[in-house]
Design a protein with these regions (language model features):
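Flexible, D/E/H-enriched segments
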Residues: 19, 26-72, 83-181, 209-320, ...
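Structural motif
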Residues: 73-75, 195
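Active-site beta-strand/loop microenvironment that shapes enzyme catalytic pockets
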Residues: 167-221, 359-379
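Short, basic/aromatic recognition patches
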Residues: 313-353
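A short mixed-secondary-structure module that forms the rim of ligand-binding clefts
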Residues: 372-399
Length: 486
């Protein structure tokens, strides 16, 4: 994940200048936030679609709105297009097709042209910004229903419109927003009038009889997202806790953040059309029209400034353990030498213990590597080694870049000696970490982690990390305590 605040501000100034020169053109002319329920198609619903008539009526109005904007290209973001955890995949090629055969309606077919000029321009913007997006890893596939359902309605009013199809990723919302900014720059580069189709359902957990059951987070997510989007409160998109979004089982938040980023620095006229969750899944339809420059709405810049101030305050209060881990991360990223500071507490130089270094960025895990028992001659050396590894060698993430350093939240856990336990009742998710072992497989989970609320969750995650089925007989368990340094 890369953010270069000074470069970002310079790019933003250039972007604002170009919009000022062509203020009346408004190259991102508008956007629609829409769901993608296959049942909305009469060929799939066979009458059941009438139960979501509010959504159908709103979709027709949204399609008419798109036609009124007279776009040259639709940029459609879909959570169901093949994507990657750390990369925004842009579909390549000149054409694509698909059908609703998966939903027993093979006769409903779609064929579209991809706007190859726009794809190229967007890839160039991403390359120049060092941003993880492009088509080089794309594996051409048929159109997905996250794209086809919106097209079902839009093509009635705007036939033969070329599209750009973009998959969501597992990257933080700040990166989704930044992608939207790059889409706006690509529209300026190509001189094309763009309408963004932010395809995404809301929560899937709103009815006991629904496909995912009921969870309180479901209707709460819908209430919040509809209010924030209808108010144009795009900065609030960064504030939805990841665990909360996962609990709500939403699939559109990334699409909405990309769309919001495309309007960065611009006023937006908004019209909320509908919301319902008849089948237990939230469907929301909102229209957005670009109303011109508004320098008060640079939400990513504001977010970065606030996050840096928060991290600076935390660093000022950090103890020697966390400061040493941060110094090691910085040295690893900058490929600079690091020597043990002269003022370290004596226990860091004389004691030996296992240590875990955890790195978060914008409240998302960015790296975590540790040792169950001591492998170095001192706790200090253990921290240096594991901080370096967490920043560069965690297989789940790309190595941390220099531009990320101001936004990293780094903590250190020093482990006590593990002790065997005979039953899960001897665990406490807040107090004890757990180690599970079966044969040559071993997994560990630290205590007091966000989103881990039960002993069963703790054991299941530790087993999953080790490739162990929690139901397997003969799993050995140990517990340990930690001292956390921040």
């Amino acid at each position: 994940m890369r953010f270069v605040l000074s470069q970002w501000k310079q790019r933003n100034k250039q972007s604002s200048d170009s919009f000022l020169q062509k203020e009346d053109e408004n190259m991102i002319s508008g956007a629609i936030m829409v769901p993608h329920p296959p049942i909305a198609l009469k060929e799939v619903g066979h009458g059941e679609e009438k139960k979501i008539q509010k959504t159908l009526d709103a979709y027709e109005k949204a399609a008419e709105f798109v036609a009124q904007l007279k776009p040259d290209v639709l940029v459609i973001t879909s959570p169901h297009t093949n994507g990657y955890a750390d990369y925004f995949n842009i579909s390549k090629g000149s054409r694509a097709a698909g059908s609703m055969a998966q939903f027993n309606a093979p006769q409903v077919r779609f064929e579209v042209d991809y706007d190859t000029d726009f794809v190229y321009a967007l890839e160039q913007e991403a390359k120049e910004a060092g941003f993880p997006a492009g088509s080089q890893y794309d594996r051409p596939t048929q159109l997905d229903h996250g794209v086809m359902v919106p097209l079902y309605f839009i093509q009635k009013y705007v036939p033969n419109i070329p599209i750009v199809r973009i998959a969501l990723s597992g990257l933080p919302m700040e990166k989704n927003y930044e992608l939207g900014e790059l889409i706006a720059k690509a529209s300026d580069r190509t001189n094309k009038n763009v309408v963004i189709v932010a395809s995404g359902d809301l929560s899937h957990c709103q009815l006991e009889t629904g496909p995912y059951g009921y969870k309180p987070a479901g209707p709460e997510y819908d209430r919040r997202i509809m209010a924030d989007m209808a108010a144009g409160a795009f900065e609030a998109l960064f504030d939805y806790d990841t665990a909360f979004r996962q609990e709500a089982a939403e699939c559109g938040h990334g699409s909405f953040a990309i769309m919001a980023g495309a309007f960065d620095g611009h006023d937006v006229k908004i019209r909320e059309l509908s919301h319902e969750a008849t089948f237990g899944v939230g469907y929301g339809v909102i229209l957005f029209k670009n109303e011109g420059i508004d320098d008060k709405r640079h939400f990513l810049e504001n977010r970065l400034d606030k996050e840096k101030a928060k991290i600076d305050e935390k660093i000022a209060g950090s103890d020697a353990y966390a400061k040493l881990a941060r110094a090691s991360v910085k040295a690893a990223v900058l490929e600079a030498p690091l020597e043990l500071p002269d003022d370290l507490p004596e226990e860091m130089l004389k004691n030996m213990a296992g240590a875990f270094v955890s790195i978060h960025e914008f409240d998302e895990l960015r790296g975590c590597i540790g040792t169950i028992a001591a492998t170095q001659d001192s706790v200090a050396e253990e921290i240096i080694k594991n901080a370096w590894s967490a920043s560069q060698n965690d297989p789940r993430f790309a190595p941390i870049k220099a531009e990320e350093l101001p936004y990293l939240d780094i903590s250190v856990d020093i482990l006590s000696d593990a002790e065997p336990i005979h039953d899960k009742s001897e665990l406490d998710v807040k107090k004890y970490g757990v180690i599970v072992t079966k044969g040559g497989r071993r997994g560990l989970l630290l205590p007091n982690l966000d989103g881990v609320d039960t002993i069963d969750q703790q054991i299941e995650i530790a087993c999953r990390k080790a490739g162990i089925d929690p139901k397997e007989p003969g799993i050995q368990m140990e517990r340990f305590e930690v001292v956390r340094h921040v």
